[in-house]
A protein has these predicted regions:
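Flexible "cap/lid" loop of the alpha/beta hydrolase fold
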Residues: 107, 114-145
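Conserved HGGG/HGGXW glycine-rich cap/lid loop of the alpha/beta-hydrolase fold
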Residues: 14-59
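Conserved loop-alpha-helix segment in the C-terminal half of the alpha/beta-hydrolase fold
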Residues: 205-242
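The conserved beta1-alpha1 loop
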Residues: 25-27, 95, 213
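Conserved alpha/beta-hydrolase catalytic His-Asp/Glu region
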Residues: 127-128, 147-204
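Gly/Ala-rich beta-loop-alpha elbow adjacent to hydrolase catalytic centers
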Residues: 94, 98, 102
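Active-site loop/oxyanion-hole signature of alpha/beta-hydrolase fold enzymes
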Residues: 51-93, 256
Length: 269
């Protein structure tokens, strides 16, 4: 892990491997650890994996005064890429609300992105926002109880033992109260209007795109979210065995799809 200081935030970043860069953006309420089963396979395949914790999420810091909504997250991700001084444009693979960040990055500066992979991502105002409403309203004074509650709810989020184990591990941090406060703040930062406003822009101008989906995703179903999202980008939709937390359920399948897609892109000039 490395710590990268930007103008107004400090990011916790897992950066491993050599080769074509893949920027990995996770979804709520996980962290860079969502990609722990994917990154070794990408490294073995000759790729560089860059998995940051979003600002104010996970172990990345952001002052309380700052808006940590997805538009600012997109700005910080570009600043991170600038700081890393990459030799070529990255492919972005993004899950859940990480896909909102990726879509905003495309809308802001599509020429800086070589390719886009959206994994069980958000589409327009379909953010499964109902699942986080109770977290938004949680009393910060009782934050220390939140992670215990979420730990008991992981079975409702996924039938997969792999997802349940991974989610419990990500929620079982040493400083429970601080972690819970970050989760509450993250939930409060979610605003589906940010992706509704850029739909037509994305339809007109975007890099080559692949959409990956878990066949049993109960939060963002493939029929109502995955297919419209793929249609927006004119992208192939590939369905893999697993649920919403596909990188935990099917890490080898996700890594193989990322590798195949990245190798299919035209070479950088």
């Amino acid at each position: 892990m490395i710590r990268i200081s930007l103008a107004d935030v400090d990011l916790n970043v897992c950066d491993s491997g050599q080769g074509h860069p893949i920027l990995l953006l996770y979804g709520f309420p996980t962290s860079h650890l969502l990609w722990r089963g994917v990154m070794p396979a990408l490294e073995d395949a000759g790729f560089r994996s860059i998995a940051p914790d979003l600002a104010g999420f996970g172990e990345s810091d952001a002052p309380e005064r700052l808006d940590i909504g997805m538009a600012n997250q997109a700005r910080w991700m570009f600043a991170l890429l600038d700081e890393l001084r990459l030799d070529e444009r990255p492919v972005i693979a993004a899950h859940d609300i990480g896909s909102a960040v990726a879509q905003l990055m495309v809308a802001r500066n599509p020429e800086r992105i070589r390719g886009l992979i959206l994994i069980d991502g958000v589409y327009a105002d379909n953010w499964a926002i109902g699942e986080v409403e109770s977290i938004r309203a949680w009393d910060p004074a009782a934050a220390s109880r939140l992670l215990k509650l979420l730990g008991r709810r992981v079975r409702a989020w996924s039938d997969s033992p792999a997802s349940q184990e991974g989610l419990r591990e990500m929620l079982a941090v040493d400083e429970a109260e601080g972690a819970a406060l970050r989760i509450i703040r993250a939930a409060q930062s979610m605003d589906p209007r940010s992706t509704v406003e850029i739909l037509e822009q994305l339809r007109r101008d975007h890099p080559p795109t692949l959409v990956l989906w878990g066949e049993s995703d109960r939060f963002l179903p493939v029929e109502s979210v995955g297919k419209p999202l793929a249609a927006l980008f004119g992208a192939e939709l590939k369905v893999l065995p697993g649920g919403h937390f596909l990188p935990l359920d099917c890490p080898r399948g996700v890594a193989a799809a990322i590798e195949s897609f990245a190798r299919s892109l035209p070479p950088e000039l």
